[in-house]
């Protein structure tokens, strides 16, 4: 009798264990797309108060005499983040890997008639004397270029020579890291 009850118990438990599998919904097979799909993440548009606070922060970060300085749209800010967070891009531009983004803004100034470029001194308010600043400019073709660099003096300015105006990113290397990171003085080539 023990053997019979054991066999019935084993059979009942075996059936009981299998039944939930039949009750579960069948997994859906997903078809692979025939073309590559690129996805992008989008950021929510800032509220009016956030936009005003961001613009005030940008104006407090840099000062450009006689220029129109505006906060960058989200899509352009994403492009700024892509270049400043990619060490290969920075290396190709001749920017130290120790550089940190200090400011990003859209710069508009009229280039005087008959001139192909204009030098613009930019005051960097969120750095300190002795820090090394680099000005990056996004050209119309979407590529970034270095348009100015130098150690910040008492006036806290670095000058860039622009042939066109559009998004600008200011990268700063802390004074203590400048020589350790291999930052050379642009005119003398010295560390």
PLM-predicted stretches and their roles:
Residues 132-143, 167-171:
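Short beta-strand segments and strand-loop junctions that repeat across beta-rich extracellular domains
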Residues 107, 146-154:
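Solvent-exposed serine/threonine-rich low-complexity stretches and specific carbohydrate-binding patches
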Residues 26-29, 90-134, 139:
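Proteolytic processing hotspots in large secreted/extracellular or virion-associated proteins
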Residues 159-182:
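C-terminal beta-strand-rich structural cap/linker in extracellular carbohydrate-active enzymes
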Residues 50-113:
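Self-processing/autoproteolytic domain segments and adjacent N-terminal interaction modules in large
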Residues 23-64:
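Low-complexity, acidic Ser/Thr/Pro-rich repeat tracts that form intrinsically disordered stalk/linker regions
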Residues 6, 15-31, 183-191:
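Sec-dependent signal peptide cleavage junction
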Residues 1-11:
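Positively charged n-region of N-terminal signal peptides that target proteins for export
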């Amino acid at each position: 009798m023990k053997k019979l009850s054991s066999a019935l118990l084993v059979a009942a438990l075996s059936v009981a264990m299998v039944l939930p599998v039949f009750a579960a919904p069948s997994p859906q097979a997903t078809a692979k797309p025939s073309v590559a799909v690129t996805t992008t993440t989008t950021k929510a548009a800032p509220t009016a108060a956030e936009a005003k606070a961001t613009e005030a922060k940008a104006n407090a970060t840099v000062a450009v005499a006689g220029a129109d300085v505006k906060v960058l749209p989200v899509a352009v800010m994403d492009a700024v983040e892509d270049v400043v967070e990619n060490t290969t891009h920075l290396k190709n531009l001749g920017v130290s890997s120790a550089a940190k983004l200090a400011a990003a803004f859209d710069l508009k100034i009229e280039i005087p008639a008959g001139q192909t470029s204009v030098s613009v001194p930019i005051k960097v308010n969120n750095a300190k004397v002795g820090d090394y600043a680099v000005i990056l400019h996004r050209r119309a073709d979407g590529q970034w270029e270095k348009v100015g660099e130098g150690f910040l003096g008492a006036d806290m300015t670095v000058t860039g020579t622009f042939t066109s105006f559009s998004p600008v990113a200011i990268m700063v290397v802390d004074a203590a890291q400048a020589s350790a990171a291999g930052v050379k003085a642009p005119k003398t080539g010295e560390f």
